[in-house]
UniProtKB/Swiss-Prot annotation:
Protein name as catalogued: 3-hydroxyacyl-[acyl-carrier-protein] dehydratase FabZ
Top EC group: lyase
Source organism of the structure: Chlamydia muridarum (strain MoPn / Nigg)
Biological role stated in the UniProt entry: Involved in unsaturated fatty acids biosynthesis. Catalyzes the dehydration of short chain beta-hydroxyacyl-ACPs and long chain saturated and unsaturated beta-hydroxyacyl-ACPs.
Any GO BP: lipid A biosynthetic process
Subcellular location, principal: cytoplasm
Any one Gene Ontology molecular-function term assigned to this protein's record: (3R)-hydroxyacyl-[acyl-carrier-protein] dehydratase activity
Length: 153
């Protein structure tokens, strides 16, 4: 997928505290503040550090990291929404419900990450998230976040 990003890696790094090797979002393809939704992309390469041990003979992306990538994509949207409070608050991944893994993600895959918030409040939020490779859903779940003061962590 060669869509021009709405937000590039520098923008993402301004919105998320994650850095290599744990930054799992490469670009934001679109977001909509009215529907509270976001679409992001992760290019999965054989150079990912987790492929060294998961699994050398048949590398697949760990499911928990697919969920983390979804949470990071949702976190970017929360960062945009929190624009005025970004210096004071940070969204932390609180939990996941109904997680399902449907297909393996392999080196060379382009992971499309979609999240839509069903709830955003001063205390946190909930989002429905799905990861795709092509038109196939590879993972999905309901993500929960808590908003905390940066000084408290």
């Amino acid at each position: 997928m060669s869509e021009k990003p709405v937000l590039g890696i520098q923008d993402i790094q301004n919105l998320l505290p994650h850095r290599y090797p744990f930054l799992l979002v490469d670009k934001i393809l679109s977001y909509d503040l009215n529907t509270r939704s976001i679409v992001a992309q992760k290019n999965v390469t054989i150079n990912e550090p987790f492929f060294v041990g998961h699994f050398p003979e048949a590398p697949i992306m760990p499911g928990v990291l697919i969920l983390e990538a979804l949470a990071q994509a949702a976190g970017v949207l929360l960062g945009i929404i929190l624009e005025n409070d970004r210096d004071k608050k940070i969204a932390l991944f609180l939990g996941i419900q109904k997680a399902k893994f449907r297909q393996p993600v392999k080196p060379g895959d382009v992971l499309i990450l979609k999240a839509e918030f069903s709830l955003i409040s001063a205390k946190g939020g909930k989002a429905i998230a799905q990861a795709f490779v092509g038109s196939q859903i590879v993972a999905e779940g309901e993500l929960s976040f808590v908003l905390v003061k940066k000084e408290s962590i």
